[in-house]
Amino acid sequence: MGKNHLQCRECKKEYEPTFKYICDECFGPLDVKYDFPSVNKDTFKDRENTYWRYFELLPIVDKNNIVSIEAGMTPLVKAEKLGKELGLNNLYIKNDSVNPTFSFKDRPAGVAISKAKEFGLKSVGCASTGNLASATAAHAAKAGIPCYIFAPSDIETAKIAQALSYGAEYISVDGTYDEANRIAAQIGDRKGVGIVNINMRSYYVEGSKTLGYEVAEQLDWNTPNHLIVPTG
């Protein structure tokens, strides 16, 4: 297998890197696999202050295909007052709201768009009602690739205004977010559009992992005992 090959999470069948996210044999999800023994903490010393400093742990083969808007290496702030109230001596808050489009979604979107560029895809998109739409549109604009945002027709315009400001096209879908997601998946498969949170998902999720890498590095490679992750 080549660098950063895919492997089925269920049956362990392996695939070369491709525009694929579901196993042909058992329909399980495909994950990216790496040559971990070839890297250590010294690998990342004195590198750029973006999440692309972890290039060896990301699924891009050629650095020329990186689409970066300088996201990542966000502050890890020690919350002393809150920690004291909770009886915790070492409580930290990772502030990803300072990323270029104001959320952690810049991480997965950036990796997915970079892989779409590496695959030579001519257009990208996502099913989203907010932050992911903005992140996908911003990276697509940087890459010079057309971008399509699939969202319910009754969505508040303000929620996708940022994405539209980057030049993305809004595809209005009658129905719920789930319906928008289904339509996006169908168009992605039929037209060869890289839908970052659907048919590019194997690569998309790799970007989110960089937040964890940063936390470890910012703590001098000491992993935290507990993590609290807000969800919406």
Per-region residue spans from a language model:
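PLP-dependent amino-acid enzyme catalytic core
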Residues: 1-232
